[in-house]
């Protein structure tokens, strides 16, 4: 059961990774006024809570990339897991002169821990989560400084988790579809708050299939 929690929960780390590589198509700030953004993200599901922070660099259109570090805690397991996340995307108009953007891209999360005492030994968990997909979004101005940034996304996700104890190891894998959506609230030209929800389809039984997220992004001045 505990091993299943690890496999099902680490997919939430993908949210922290994607928050470190966001664009308008993902409900976040454009790189028009600043090429460097700092971000923080929180992701919650039935069995886990994950949070992290990182930085992104990119262009208004074209390539953008980022990295982050996150920490996860799990129900029923002592200790925390640390994850190193990265992502890469490409932003482009949905069609010529359209205000909508589409961004194909992917993320990779490497998880380390937690460790559990089992009998006279220590069981060490590790995980790898990868996503490949695309997102679509736009900016809707409300006032001179405030905009709403609605977005939707779809991605394929794959998680591999390993448990090692006394020289023996066991591995489990899971592949699934991630359907996401939400809206960023651009409160100032350099600050966005972004609530989101991600649903997993086709995952193994017992997997957390609903993940709630909240992220904040701040654009560094030139």
Language-model features, listed with the residues they occupy:
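Short glycine/proline- and aromatic-enriched beta-strand/turn motifs that initiate or cap beta-hairpins
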Residues: 20-75, 222
């Amino acid at each position: 059961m505990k091993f299943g929690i690890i496999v099902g929960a680490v997919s939430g780390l993908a949210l922290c990774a994607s928050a470190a590589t966001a664009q308008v198509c993902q409900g976040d700030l454009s790189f028009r006024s600043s090429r460097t953004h700092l971000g923080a993200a929180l992701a919650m599901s039935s069995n886990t809570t994950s949070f992290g922070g990182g930085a992104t660099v990119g262009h208004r259109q074209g390539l953008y990339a980022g990295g982050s570090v996150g920490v996860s805690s799990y129900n029923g397991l002592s200790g925390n897991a640390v994850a190193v996340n990265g992502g890469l995307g490409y932003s482009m108009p949905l069609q010529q002169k359209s205000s909508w953007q589409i961004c194909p891209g992917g993320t990779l999360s490497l998880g380390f821990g937690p460790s559990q005492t089992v009998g006279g030994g220590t069981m060490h968990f590790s995980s790898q989560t990868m996503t490949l997909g695309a997102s679509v979004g736009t900016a809707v101005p409300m006032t001179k400084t405030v905009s709403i940034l609605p977005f939707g996304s779809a991605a394929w996700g794959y998680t591999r988790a390993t448990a090692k104890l006394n020289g023996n190891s066991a591995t489990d894998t899971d592949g699934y579809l991630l359907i996401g959506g939400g809206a960023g609230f651009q409160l100032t030209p350099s600050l966005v708050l972004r609530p989101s929800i991600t649903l997993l389809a086709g995952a193994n039984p017992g997997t957390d299939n609903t993940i709630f997220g909240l992220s904040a992004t701040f654009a560094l001045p030139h």
